[in-house]
Regions:
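Histidine-acidic metal/acid-base catalytic patches
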Residues: 1-7, 11, 16-27, 94-95, ...
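Hydrophobic anchor at the start of a short beta-strand
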Residues: 3, 60, 140
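Active-site-proximal loop/turn and secondary-structure-junction residues that shape catalytic pockets
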Residues: 9-11, 38-40, 66-69, 103-106, ...
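Structural motif corresponding to the early beta-alpha repeats
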Residues: 20, 32, 36-124, 231, ...
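Conserved dinucleotide-binding and phosphotransfer motif residues
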Residues: 29, 56, 136, 228
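Generic enzyme active-site microenvironment
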Residues: 33, 141, 174-177, 235-236
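Catalytic-core regions built around general acid/base machinery
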Residues: 45-57, 125-133, 190, 220-225
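Active-site acidic/histidine proton-transfer and metal-coordination neighborhood
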Residues: 55, 74-172, 182, 254, ...
Length: 287
């Protein structure tokens, strides 16, 4: 497995100036990769980003949430086009995955529980995108997020259900400890219930601040990862910088940490220590 961090730890934007800051920060922290948000995939400077990654010896992964106008249940055609564009960009960047809230615009709520028709649309579109992504060597990670950000998939059990519906080998589960702290009754059981279908996890504190300073039960998290012999990526996620596309949807109204440097220093030290304590971390080459 590899250890990485989300770009929003360093910057809420992605242009070449900000990308250089993000990639340099991740490299200085000794990370294996950086997670690049593809909220506006058509605007990303692919060649410039690739050059920066190569210069600093870093790999990348890619993630996204759908734009408001492409909320999948309401606009499946627009969602499919957007996702396939993001797959193209991820492939050109050299990312092996595209993960996140691939099925919804974060913050779009209907005031009602999800319907069977909505899940049929999600299944149909993500199955099509999975076939497209497979030809480009990309796997899709579906993330469960909390009830205030989506009404569709909040729990590991719901992730399992949608994976059963899509039934494609390059589609997997993506968990996030911040969302789990809100929705799940614990951390160990949801991780173990997904087993090998869990291939990506955001390690995020209960307030999205520095890991180890909040309410997440980290021993249970890493005990669960060890139980399933987790071989996916470990990704520290926080928001030292606010992105204008996500600030409202994620309700981030203030700085969550003193600085990116403090977050990376203290957060990564804590997470690496916990992973080592539970023997839940191995190097990429051990996969």
């Amino acid at each position: 497995m590899a250890f990485g961090a989300h770009a929003f730890i360093w910057s809420g934007e992605w242009n070449l100036k900000e990308a250089e800051k993000v990639i340099r920060g991740a490299s200085d922290a000794g990370l294996d990769f950086v997670e690049i948000p593809l909220l506006r995939p058509r605007d990303l400077d692919i060649s410039g980003t690739k050059a920066l990654l190569e210069e600093h010896g870093l790999n990348c992964t890619c993630s996204l949430g759908l734009p408001r106008e492409a909320h999948l249940p309401a606009a499946p055609g627009k969602a499919e086009v957007f996702l396939k564009t993001a797959v193209d960009v991820a492939a050109e960047l050299g990312s092996p995955v595209l993960c996140g809230v691939l099925y919804a615009h974060i913050g779009t709520l209907t005031g009602k529980p999800p319907t069977e028709e909505e899940f049929k649309k999600i299944t149909r579109v993500l199955k099509s995108v999975a076939h497209y992504a497979e030809k480009k060597g990309i796997s899709l990670g579906i993330e469960a997020v909390n009830r205030y950000e989506t009404y569709l998939i909040n729990l590991a059990s719901q992730l399992g259900d949608i994976l059963d519906r899509i039934a494609e080998p390059n589609v997997f589960a993506h968990l996030d400890t911040y969302h789990m702290n809100i929705e799940e009754k614990g951390f160990y059981e949801p991780i173990v219930s997904l087993g090998k279908r869990l291939r990506y996890i955001h390690l995020s504190e209960s307030d999205r601040g520095i890991p180890g300073t909040g309410n997440v039960h980290w021993d249970d998290v890493f005990r669960g990862l060890r139980e399933i012999d987790y071989r996916g990526d470990l990704v520290m996620e926080s928001f030292a910088a606010v992105n204008e596309d996500l600030a409202g949807a994620t309700a981030i109204w203030r700085s969550l940490v003193e600085s990116p440097e403090v977050l990376v220093r203290d957060g990564l030290t804590f997470l690496r220590t916990k992973a080592t304590e539970h023997n839940a971390y191995s190097n990429r080459e051990d996969n």
